[in-house]
Amino acid sequence: MKQKTLKGSFSLFGKGLHTGLNLTVTFNPAPENSGYKIQRIDLEGQPIIDAVAENVVDTQRGTVLGKGEARVSTVEHGLSALYAMGIDNCMIHVNGPEFPILDGSAIQYVDKIKEIGIEEQNAPKDFYIIRKKIEVKDENTGSCITILPDEDFSITAMCSFESKFISSQFATLDNPQNYDKEIASARTFVFVRDIEPLLQANLIKGGDLDNAIVIYERQTTQERLDMLADMLHVEHRDATDLGYIQHKPLQWDNECTRHKLLDIIGDMALIGKPIKGRIVATRPGHTINNKFARQMRKEIRKHEVQAPIYDPNEEPVMDVNRIRELLPHRYPMQLVDKVISLGATTIVGVKNITANEPFFQGHFPQEPVMPGVLQIEAMAQCGGLLVLNTLEEPERWSTYFMKIDDVKFRQKVVPGDTLLFKVELLAPVRHGISSMKGYIFVGDHVVAEATFTAQIVKNK
């Protein structure tokens, strides 16, 4: 699967939720491996903020990104749409300190993405695959986010609002392809009891019933409710009439929790990589979401290169006989047993290391260790299979080493190990020359890596 960006640019206009300013945000295509970036085009020097979890400077009333003096708030809805729609790279321009709130959901972003289109890029999509349970908790609030291994990406959110009118809810997104229909149009919400402190803090200047669900669930005095109505420029309401205050009816009974799930995805976008795993979030909010995103980035840095998933029960893409048809190597120099994954730019091969390998007789009799040069040779044979896969009549071609760089051996390879080779093309093959980066894994650990250049020659 390849990385994706937008086919073109689109803009959205509206009021900022907290500032009340008229704002424009423009989403633009971006190069491979650039991720999400936000540029304050209204400031001197037009600073660019990388949209990553470490750059979050506030989570009290939304996610605020910052770099130096530059700040951008209310970014989560736009980022949620990008992430859920599979966009990997995007440059975002905004002419003020926050994104426009629009209707309080992500649906307008989704509609614009569909309208402008999505473009596939050349670089492979770099998923982070969850291999073990990761959990982040906030003991003070009881919030918790857990991610578990799964072949796909899904989220379940469970919320408890400490309200008699709206108590416990849950929402689930089992397939990101359903995001536009099940999640994107869920609107942000606020309790009447929280509005006065926000107004006193000089916030929600752009808030109204067109961009939020307002929940009146604790009776207050008529005088106080009238005062809040005047401040928000809405009609007065009977103080004994509890319920939802809005221009549009609820789309789902659990719309509030669906919006919480939307926010989780927006804050997950700050991890910087698409994830394969199942998330269960209890009492989510921007603070715990950001704490989770930061922890995920730490995990990714620990395992910058992930081992491929290997299921010995699955049929190989190439068995040893097919490999023998493509490569000239024979025992004892055919060092790839099978290929389990083969794409346009990436290959994954397997070799089982046994005690009766002939090189162990001399390397070393008392402490058998696979020679590093043979590890590189095995990795290069995988690379040869990858390059040959791009050619017509691959049996008529051979590959030859030209250069090896940046070789690192990190761990001994011994009898009983199963080697997984992962080799990626660094650039398209040009004039018969290919550049590749290869890794060897034992379990989850990188045991060796190298960059190499090879020449392909038609000689049969």
Give residue ranges: language-model regions.
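Short Pro/Gly-enriched beta-strand edge/turn motifs at strand-loop
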Residues: T5-S9, V317-I323, L420-F421
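Non-catalytic linker/capping segments at the edges of enzyme domains
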Residues: K302-V369, R396-S398, V413-V414, L426-P428, ...
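Hydrophobic beta-strand-centered segment that forms part of the acyl-chain substrate-binding groove
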Residues: G272-A281, P308-V317, G383-L420, V447, ...
